[in-house]
């Protein structure tokens, strides 16, 4: 049976091979307990509300009340972000306020006709498979297929980061051909905390480049397995100008138990 990979799984390997080994290869009974983070809880909670809206379970005017009523029970972890070795910030109030304002002002997607929300896929891609969940599939006013991924990020830090994340949309575009019989005409990230849209016109060449990237990462994973056998992969340390990147380490699911964490 072919191994199936999600975009997040491939991205984790590129971020830290040791974390990847712990999450996907180490014996389950030996893995340390995974840690969450308030920002991830927030993103999942808002995704859930938008999913309920997309399925017709919540109307626009009900979303804010639902957000207020269920926020605490859905946020299991704190929002503290370690910025440097000696400085951290608690972002709970900021995230809560951003979510409140978003759902307060949300007026739906009047320019779209929703086809599906949180559509799962697991499709063949050569020597491996790709899986995932498309947040929103819809048709625009011209009847063209569009794919939307919700992001709780406020913005992309750079054009390079935006283009790197666009690979996720192109994985979804590839799956759309099997799911709907056509490629989308446009792809978008909806940065809901700031109510901003980041659009991409579909480019088949860019999609093929993304599939080639997926294949190269899968190949590297297999090479690491052969190299290390049953031993852990070596970590990749995120750095900024040679210093440990405390910010990125906030989101590692094994940060407290990791022997490499500073």
Describe the predicted segments one by one.
Residues 38, 42, 46, 91, ...:
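Hydrophobic (often cysteine-bearing) scaffold residues that line and stabilize catalytic clefts
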Residues 174-262:
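Metal-dependent nuclease catalytic regions and adjoining charged, substrate-binding loops involved
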Residues 10-58, 118:
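Nuclease catalytic cores
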Residues 116-174, 192:
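Non-catalytic protein-protein interaction segments used by genome-maintenance enzymes to assemble
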Residues 30-32, 147, 155-158, 197-200:
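Short small-residue beta-strand/loop micro-motif enriched in glycine and branched aliphatics
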Residues 3, 129, 162-165, 169, ...:
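Active-site-proximal structural scaffolding
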Residues 18-25, 144-149, 222-223:
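Active-site-adjacent bridging/hinge elements
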């Amino acid at each position: 049976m072919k191994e199936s990979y999600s975009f997040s799984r491939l991205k984790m390997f590129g971020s830290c091979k040791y974390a990847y080994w712990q999450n996907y290869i180490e014996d389950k009974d030996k893995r340390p307990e995974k840690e969450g983070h308030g920002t991830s809880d927030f993103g999942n909670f808002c995704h859930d509300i938008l999913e309920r809206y997309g399925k017709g379970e919540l109307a626009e005017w009900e979303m804010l009340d639902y957000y207020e009523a269920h926020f605490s029970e859905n946020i299991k972890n704190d929002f503290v972000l370690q910025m440097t070795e000696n400085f951290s910030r608690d972002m709970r109030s900021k995230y809560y306020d951003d979510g409140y304002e978003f759902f307060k002002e949300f007026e739906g997607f009047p320019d779209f006709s929703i086809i599906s929300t949180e559509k799962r896929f697991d499709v063949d891609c050569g020597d491996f498979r790709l899986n995932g969940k498309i947040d929103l599939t819809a048709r625009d006013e011209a009847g063209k297929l569009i794919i939307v991924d919700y992001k709780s990020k406020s913005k992309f830090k750079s054009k390079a980061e935006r283009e790197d994340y666009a690979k996720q949309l192109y994985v979804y575009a590839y799956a759309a051909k099997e799911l709907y019989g056509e490629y989308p005409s446009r792809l978008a990230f909806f940065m809901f905390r700031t109510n901003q849209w980041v659009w991409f016109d579909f480019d088949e060449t860019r999609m093929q480049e993304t599939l080639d990237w997926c294949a190269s990462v899968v190949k590297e994973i297999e090479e690491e397995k052969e190299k290390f056998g049953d031993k852990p992969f070596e970590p990749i340390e995120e750095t900024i100008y040679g210093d440990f990147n405390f910010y990125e380490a906030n989101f590692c699911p094994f940060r407290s138990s990791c022997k490499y964490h500073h």
